């Protein structure tokens, strides 16, 4: 364990496949360093694999291909409520929609 105080860190991507294949090692390293890691993505078959590794994965109400304004507002509202409840120290979005919406919601939540 490092001498850095533990933080809650959110990793947000547009697929659970992406988190599993490209950010799994980061999530595990952060967790093993004492941080609380929350993974967010739309539902998929890899969410269960992430949980099986002992990681916390939450299914986000996101359609990565949609531009429906109501769906996008629903996602922003969901993220805002989640960030207010969880109070993460850091939100890191890996794809454009996740980076933009995650940043907007994090800012509004005071992250």
Each language-model region and where it sits:
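N-terminal strand-loop element at the rim of the active site
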Residues: 8-70
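Alpha-helical elements of Rossmann-like donor-binding domains used by nucleotide-donor carbohydrate transfer enzymes
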Residues: 25, 74-81, 101
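Glycine-rich phosphate-binding loop signature in dinucleotide/nucleotide-binding domains
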Residues: 82-89
């Amino acid at each position: 364990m490092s001498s850095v105080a533990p933080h809650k860190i959110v990793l947000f991507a547009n697929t659970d496949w992406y988190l599993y294949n490209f950010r799994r090692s980061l999530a595990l390293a952060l967790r093993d360093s004492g941080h609380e890691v929350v993974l967010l993505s739309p539902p998929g078959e890899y969410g269960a694999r992430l949980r099986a590794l002992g990681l916390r994965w939450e299914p986000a109400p996101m359609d990565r291909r949609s531009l429906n304004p109501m769906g996008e507002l629903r996602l922003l509202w969901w993220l805002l409520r989640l960030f207010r409840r969880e109070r993460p120290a850091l939100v890191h979005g890996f794809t454009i929609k996740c980076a933009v919406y995650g940043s907007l919601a994090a800012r509004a939540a005071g992250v």
